[in-house]
Each structure stands twice: as structure tokens, then as C-alpha cells.
Amino acid sequence: MLLTHPSSPRAAQALARKLGNAACFIAGGTLLQQSWAEPRLAPSATHFINVMHWPEMQQISLGPQYLHIGAGMRLEAVRRHPWVQQHAPVLVQALAQLGAMGIRRLGTLGGNIGWGEGDCCPVLLATDAQVELTDGNLQSLAQTLKLMDRPLMLSFLLPRSDVTEPRPLVFEKVGYRAAFSPARLRMALRWSDAQKRLNLDRIAAAAPGIGVHRLQATEKLLSYAQELQIRPSLDDIRTTCEQSLPPDLARIASRLIAGHCGLLA
């Protein structure tokens, strides 16, 4: 095993490109250790790149339009930060359900998002979060997560609640550790206005082995139903969910969506 401490985020990204598949960014390492054959023995063929020694990745700030959260921020520090509580309360709710305190104190937001299946992923995807990359450019999180080789992410930008009027947003996690069962499904739902009902324009979901993504077929179904003022059935919603989720998870997702849209009464 090799561990390198690059001088800057740009140098880290350049090294990762040079090493190719052998490269692996590491921060808290809480997720990486779960994939190792021996939890305390890192794979010898992997070249780890430490990303936890640059101040710019470990701070939270307010810009004119966005809340900036450094990718190297510890999960528990993000959860407790007053600006995050003010501008991203649903992210705080998701973080409160994420693992044990020891995990939250060690793991980072960048690691959770980079994994693509973490609790924070649906929330940030549903809020149209942006990512700051090492070249200084901004990219939508949706676009970043589609890349096979995900770049090093410096920070995440979320809309400020005192600049952009917040839209109704909820987070759902089915089967979490408080019930001593592994999480089966993580979802975030966002409505276009305070009336809620069928005005659901963002449905983001992730599950073990299934990267976070939007359920666009379901979004289109609800938009069509809202336009025509018709009531979609639970079976209609489940069928659209099955376009990207296995049947058992599609059943769970469809009931959550229908319930939040007032379609189960």
C-alpha cells in the first residue's frame, strides 16, 4: 500500500489521472474499509491519495447565492453547523440518521457523496446541488455522479434559503440502524411549490448497489397527471419506479411517493 500527500487538490487530481485504476482518494476511510477483505489491512495494489490536509476542503461559508460546504468536512460537523441547519435542514435530518456517532465524526461529506449511495446523495441531488472541482469550475452534482471516474470534489454548493425561496423537501430512509436493519432505500422528494400534492418535480433515490439517481419516469407521470388534473394510481407510480428500481424497492418507493402526495387516502 502506498499513501501520498499531494501539495494541492490540483496535484491530487493530476496524480489520480496518472495512476488510473490504482488511485483511490481517501479521507475518513469509513466506507473504504468496508470493502477490504481484511478491515485493518489496506489492499497492497492501491495507491491512496490523502485529501484531508487542505484547509479549503474543510470549511463552510456563505456566498451571495449558495451555502458552500467543503467536501472534507466531517459529517457530524456538517450536521451541527448553524448555517447548514438554517439553509439545509433536510440535509441535517439525513445526517442524523447516518450511522453511529463514531462514523459521523470520522466520515466526510465528500466520501458519502463520492460513494454514490450515501444518505446525503438523494438530498443534494434533489436540491440541484453543484460541485466545485479542482480546476475551479462548477458542475451539477447530477453530471458529476454520472462520470465513471469521479473527479476530486472540493465543495458542494446548495441554494441559500434566504436568497432562493425554499421548496418543500423531505427525506425518507427505509430500514435504518435504529431498527437494527441495513438501509434498503434512501429517497428525497422535492415539490415545486408549497401546495405539494402532485407538484413533485424531484424524486431522487439510492439503495445498496444502486447509485443515486432521479426517478424521471415517475416525475413525468406526476407532472402529466397534474397537468390533466387526474389522479394516478399506486400501480401507475409503482410501474414507473420499476424502470430504475427492482420490484421490491419500487413497491416501497411508490408507497412513499403516493403517501407524500396524498394519494393513499
Residue ranges, per PLM feature:
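C-terminal structural segment of proteins
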Residues: 1-265
